[in-house]
């Protein structure tokens, strides 16, 4: 008889222990360190950052990535364990992966009563581009970034679901997507994504720096091949015809400092959309500098809009250009981007 009463008590004990453990993890920061960032210098940079975190009295635990996209898996697992506060130690790719790991957990079929707004993301910038950091207004200096985390000051930002479809009909009608990703900053289709393909390939070969983006951009402009597509914003067609590149974002900076969506606001619930039509090379040469000055929105030939959802529909299979999200190529058009109802907490 005593044994029969002991089993329920043991179960209750373990249940309470698990609940206490999860509550503890919800208040503890988890630092996901991309040891491959900054030409593999992130490991030594992290050692200094760890000391500063401890000196600032920040309660944290660290886990280290083992390869490309590993931060996505680590953040998904950590979210399932109960962690709700994440520090991405790396560049834009690390931020993208951490967000996607969190989102995968939140939107998985077996997850209930968990929202994006339950999570907080902080960043210690260690990378070459750091475009999200510039868009969000987070200091690039590591000491200052840690001071911001210690201050506890947070805001919110929009998160965008990007869905790749087999056909244009599926994209318009909301059919089953063949691939999905979540965006924290800026994405693009066409020339923009081709630049990312080159940059990512060069990074894998060890190249770094802002010049990498500029040289890739100039190469893609020189070898540009305009394609045809339609663009729908909240169901209304805003563009149809030949284009060179498209950008969509909740942030302002991409490609190492370019501002294709130079008026975007990260928490207004809207996507900023910029379509660059097929224009002569001389016009491109004249207007490209404005990408870096913040005046690109003043270029008269652009089609620009703000909306909650964007659908890009290529006219034919040969017009299906690559799609990039936060610098990562995720597939080819047709594609739909939509701002989620729930927002993510960010340390700013």
Question: What spans do the regions from the language model cover?
Answer:
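ATP/nucleoside-binding phosphotransfer catalytic cores, i.e., glycine-rich phosphate-binding loops
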Residues: 233-235, 240, 259-260, 265-348
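Catalytic core of DAGKc-family lipid kinases
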Residues: 56, 104-244
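Glycine-rich phosphate/pyrophosphate-binding beta-alpha loops
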Residues: 188, 192, 247-260, 329
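Short glycine-/acidic-enriched loop or helix-start segments at secondary-structure transitions
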Residues: 97-99, 133-135, 257-258, 285
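ATP/NTP phosphate-donor binding region
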Residues: 14-89, 96, 100-107, 143
């Amino acid at each position: 008889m005593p044994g029969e009463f002991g089993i329920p008590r043991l179960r209750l004990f373990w249940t309470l222990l698990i609940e206490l453990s999860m509550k503890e993890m919800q208040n503890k920061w988890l630092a996901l360190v991309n040891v491959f960032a900054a030409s593999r210098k992130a490991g030594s940079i992290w050692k200094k950052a760890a000391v500063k975190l401890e000196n600032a009295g920040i309660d944290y635990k660290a886990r280290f990535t083992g390869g490309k996209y590993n931060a996505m898996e680590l953040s998904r697992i950590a979210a399932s364990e109960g962690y709700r506060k994440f520090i991405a130690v790396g560049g834009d790719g690390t931020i993208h992966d951490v967000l996607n790991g969190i989102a995968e957990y939140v939107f998985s079929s077996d997850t209930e009563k968990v929202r994006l707004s339950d999570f907080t993301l902080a960043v210690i910038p260690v990378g070459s581009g750091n475009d999200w950091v510039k868009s969000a207004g987070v200091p690039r200096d590591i000491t200052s970034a840690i001071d911001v985390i210690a201050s506890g000051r947070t805001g919110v930002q929009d998160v965008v679901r990007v869905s790749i479809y087999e056909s244009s009909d599926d994209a318009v009608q909301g059919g089953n997507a063949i691939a999905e990703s979540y965006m924290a900053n800026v994405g693009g289709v066409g020339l923009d994504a081709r630049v990312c393909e080159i940059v990512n390939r060069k990074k894998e070969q060890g190249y770094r720096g802002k010049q990498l983006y500029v040289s890739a951009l100039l190469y893609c402009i020189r070898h540009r091949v305009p394609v045809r597509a339609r663009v729908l914003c909240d169901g209304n067609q805003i563009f149809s015809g030949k284009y060179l590149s498209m950008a969509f974002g909740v942030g302002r900076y991409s490609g190492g400092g370019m501002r294709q969506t130079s008026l975007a606001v990260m928490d207004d619930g809207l996507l900023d959309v910029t379509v660059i039509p097929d224009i002569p090379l001389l016009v491109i040469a004249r207007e490209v500098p404005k990408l870096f000055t913040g005046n690109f929105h003043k270029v008269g030939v652009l089609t620009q809009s703000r909306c909650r959802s964007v659908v890009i529909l290529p006219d034919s299979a040969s017009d299906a250009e690559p799609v990039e999200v936060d610098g990562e190529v995720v597939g080819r058009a047709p594609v739909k981007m939509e701002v989620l109802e729930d927002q993510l907490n960010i340390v700013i």
